């Protein structure tokens, strides 16, 4: 679901960045911070998706600690409903990095 789509969007953004860097050598430097933030967000999403899947399987098998697994599912849902937009924001910032920064002349 959300995690796979996020990881794929990140992979697509990095592939496009690598292709565009052939004609804009500064692009990777302008985008680096946001690529790293996006990577972190995508990996957090994957971790929460995995926790949700494990919790769902445990609950389906009648795990003794249902409250623990239900809480895991609640936290995973919170991540995707409230925090998941951060990945989209960072990927948008990576795309925005294609705009060249103006050079600032430093006073001697």
Each language-model region and where it sits:
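C-terminal amphipathic alpha-helical interaction region
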Residues: 1-108
């Amino acid at each position: 679901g959300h995690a796979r789509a996020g990881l794929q969007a990140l992979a697509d953004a990095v592939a496009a960045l690598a292709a565009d860097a052939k004609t804009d050598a500064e692009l990777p430097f302008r985008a680096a911070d946001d690529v790293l933030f996006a990577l972190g967000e995508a990996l957090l999403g994957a971790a929460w998706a995995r926790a949700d899947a494990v919790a769902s399987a445990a609950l389906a098998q009648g795990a003794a600690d249902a409250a623990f697994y239900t809480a895991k599912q609640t936290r995973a849902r919170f991540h995707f409903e409230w925090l998941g937009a951060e990945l989209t924001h960072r990927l948008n910032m990576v795309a925005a990095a294609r705009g060249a920064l103006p050079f600032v002349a430093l006073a001697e």
